[in-house]
Amino acid sequence: MLLSTLSIKRAVLAIALITSFGSLSAQQKKAFISGERLNYQVHYGFIRGGEVVLAVRDAIYEGKTVNNLYLNGKTVGLFSSLYLVDDTYQSFTDIQTNWPLKSIRDIHEDRYKHYSTQTFDHWSRSDSSICNSSKTGRVVVVKGCQDILSSVYYLRSIMVDRKPKPDERFIVDTYFTDEKFSLVIRFKGYEKISTEFGKIDCMKFMPEVLTGRVFKSKDDMSIWFSNDNNFIPIKIKFDIFIGSVSCDLIDYQGLLYPLAFKR
């Protein structure tokens, strides 16, 4: 039960949590298009425990065409029978700025259920944005603040043609679970990651995680992104008290640029 709750849920969130450089300015060059879909498997050692899906779709929000970003993470097999996890996150974002307009969190974890929405107003204030939560009401947040899912795609857009320096640190500003959340992440260099498709050139990043109940060290989480203009998450790894958990890309479709790999 502990494994499924921690590893599957954190795999779902890590793709989003550790991938937003909120203080940077968005570029116009795109990194993704509607129709993109990324599929991941979550493993504890050699045991398959979960699945994660990331997708981009078209939608209409307040009469305007927007991106509908979608993330679902769930347990499978034995883990699902022990402790069911089926979490869905959605974000509706402005196509030009990649700023979130509305976010949805729909959580099903065994007997626990949670559904909440947030809407964002980035334009009525010059120095900040406003988030209206269905649970906590109105909150003033950092200008252009991202939700947990939109941060992934915002980062991907601003990382097009960008080459970070070794150990360069970034501060992330998001609003998640009705709390302002700041995260420090570091670029650690370039590595080749073996996948089902072949070896892929990647950029490695590490967030500074909180130690204690789950992590022994602040460097116990790593994520690898494709070193190209797609900048898609290829692999995530967690070193936690009960072992090592990985989340690996197993299928993709609808990428804006070809994904390069060597067999």
Regions found by a protein language model. Give the residues of each.
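Hydrophobic, well-structured mid-protein blocks that either form specific transmembrane helices
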Residues: S116-M159
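Acidic, serine/threonine-rich low-complexity disordered tracts
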Residues: Q27-H122, D161-R263
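Bacterial N-terminal signal peptides that target proteins for export
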Residues: M1-V12
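Bacterial N-terminal signal peptides
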Residues: A11-S20
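Single-residue recognition of alpha-helix boundary sites
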Residues: S20-F21, V56
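Sec/Tat signal peptide C-region and signal peptidase I cleavage site
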Residues: G22-A26
